[in-house]
Amino acid sequence: MYASCERTWLFSLPGWAGRTPGRDAVAEPRRPPGGGGAGGEGLGRSRGGFTTKVHLSADGRCRPLSLVVTAGQRADCTQFEPVLEKVRVPRTGPRRPRNKPDSVACDKAYSNGPCRSYLRRRGIQHAIPEKTDSQAARLRRGSRGGRPPGFDKERYKKRNTVERANNKLKHARAVATRYDKRDYVYLGTVTAAVLAIWLGT
């Protein structure tokens, strides 16, 4: 997710999966109540095998602002609010950190009612393309289908910053290929890589 705030911080919110080596031949651990990944491990089955997904937001300089670690099969849109709620951008002086971006740019994975309603409720502008099936359903209904959601192409072009932030994170071998057993340990590994990115800018 790419977000822009006081000094243009952009939210691009994607999820990407880190592969866990040597786990495919191991019996899957018991899952916690309610489904999801293995209890306390943040691991789950996805098309890439046994994986962990990192959901993050980034500013206009490709620096991660917030992140959430989940099991690999978790849908990106389910972590939209948790990632946005974790954003804190310090201000100069004794003022509280900024936690509301001026705008966000996300891909079609976030083109749904709950995500758009959340942004509308918080007064955040967005650039989220409409899904093809949603567009077709709206057009089928004619005038009853309502107006298409607003979409700013220029703002959406800046979404690449989060993809570049992901690439920077994946330069850390322990992030791209997960070796940590517990999810909180892996979260610490990713956080250390984020700090390295910030210190290098």
Q: What is each PLM-predicted segment?
A:
Residues 73, 91-179:
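Helix-centered, glycine/charged polyanion-binding patches within enzymatic domains
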Residues 44, 178-187:
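Structural motif
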Residues 82-85, 167, 194-197:
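Generic alpha-helical structural context detector
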Residues 52-64, 73, 80-83, 165:
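Short conserved beta-strand segments at catalytic cores or DNA/RNA-binding microdomains
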Residues 1-46, 58-61:
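Active-site- or DNA-interface-adjacent structural scaffold in DNA-acting proteins
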Residues 68-94:
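Active-site beta-loop-alpha junctions of metal-dependent nucleic acid enzymes
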Residues 189-201:
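Charged phosphate-binding loop/patch that engages nucleotide di/tri-phosphates or the phosphate backbone
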Residues 59, 67-70, 106-108:
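Short His-Asn-centered micro-motif
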